[in-house]
């Protein structure tokens, strides 16, 4: 079974290795991130994909990004390594690649204790990235970037809260904005994991797409930077009766479980990341790169990055139109109408990538409810 993606043709037999054509967006993001990183560092870079499958992500990077000094590809499945070697030869990138048929953590740890570390690591597991983050942080160069995926959406979104607590040391929240809570729990766990090694992990671009969460973040050293990042951890509370949400800053802060608006008991999520999940400058660099080099081939990536850039500096949650219409028992207005009306009232609102009927706003809930009632 041969496929074409980007500038690469490759073999991915479904019975031997896992390959998901729907994850092209995730791989597109990796290409652009690595391309920008190579320009920022202004030196040949070393990359690693320890859970490579058929190797498509790294082979695409080698074909589509200049200035790659070396790529380390690993997989514990010997059949996968055979297919990776076939795909490397097929795409004529052999001189830049080393392949290893070993456990992902063993591969990462072998570089963590060596002088040569990675500028970019990509962790793309089936399930949770938790088992691999610690050694990934240890094997990254200072100013390096870590990209990772989580597909264990059910625990992170609150369907299996005990699993989420075991895995991420955080309580999830089943709510209309569960997807954002899931993303923020994942980032928060990465921040805390890095902090144990006096490393700061700061998200530069992160998103939720269909069945997975994707996070890219940069690392740096220094206790002050770590402590500053830890200040961006906190909690989100939610009243299911009156729909009010609240962001509580500080992992050490006390949570008031009584809703100040209706006196009902509030639910909560956390600890989680309450800072920005993307950097505006990095989003713009990605858009510039797409416009200069990729145009129509990256149309979905471009659309999502534009939405992500718009979401920056808004509260750490979103609203969904059918949630509010159900509460007031009236049909929902169109999203464009909601945003226009909020903007008229000297607040601001933007659509969110999390949900086609969702929006982020700095307007109080009372203002939103009034707009829906007057529609």
Give the role of each language-model region:
Residues 1-375:
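SAM-dependent transferase fold signal centered on methyltransferase-like domains
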């Amino acid at each position: 079974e041969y496929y074409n993606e980007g500038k690469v043709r490759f073999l991915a037999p479904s019975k031997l290795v896992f390959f998901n054509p729907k994850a092209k967006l995730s791989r597109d993001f990796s290409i652009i991130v690595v391309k920008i990183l190579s320009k920022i560092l202004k030196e040949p870079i070393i990359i690693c994909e320890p859970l490579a499958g058929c190797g498509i992500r790294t082979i695409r990077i080698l074909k589509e990004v200049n200035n790659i000094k070396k790529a380390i590809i690993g997989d514990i499945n010997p059949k996968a390594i055979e297919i990776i070697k076939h795909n490397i030869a097929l795409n004529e990138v052999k001189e830049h690649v080393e392949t290893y048929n070993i456990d992902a953590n063993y591969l990462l740890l072998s570089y963590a204790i060596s002088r040569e570390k990675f500028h970019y690591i990509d962790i793309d597991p089936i399930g949770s990235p938790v088992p691999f983050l610690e050694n990934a942080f240890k094997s990254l160069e200072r100013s390096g970037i870590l990209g990772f995926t989580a597909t264990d959406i059910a625990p992170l979104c609150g369907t299996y809260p005990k699993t989420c607590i075991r895995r991420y040391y955080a309580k999830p929240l089943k709510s209309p904005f569960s997807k954002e809570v899931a993303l923020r729990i994942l980032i928060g766990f990465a921040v805390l994991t890095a902090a144990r090694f006096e490393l700061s992990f700061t998200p530069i671009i992160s998103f939720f797409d269909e069945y997975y969460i994707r996070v890219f973040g940069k690392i740096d050293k220094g206790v002050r930077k770590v402590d500053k990042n830890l200040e961006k951890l906190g909690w989100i509370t939610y009243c299911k009766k009156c729909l009010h949400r609240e962001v509580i800053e500080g992992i050490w802060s006390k949570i008031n479980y009584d809703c100040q608006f209706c006196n009902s008991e509030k639910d909560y999520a956390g600890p989680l990341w309450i800072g920005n999940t993307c950097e505006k400058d990095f989003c713009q660099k990605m858009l510039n790169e797409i416009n200069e080099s990729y145009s129509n081939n990256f149309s979905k990536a471009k659309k999502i990055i534009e939405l992500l850039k718009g979401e920056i500096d808004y509260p750490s949650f979103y609203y969904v139109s059918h949630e509010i219409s159900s509460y007031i028992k009236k049909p929902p207005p169109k999203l464009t109408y909601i945003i226009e009306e909020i903007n008229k009232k000297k607040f601001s609102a933007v659509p969110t990538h999390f949900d086609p009927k969702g929006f982020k706003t700095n307007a109080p809930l009372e203002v939103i409810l009034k707009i829906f009632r007057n529609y």
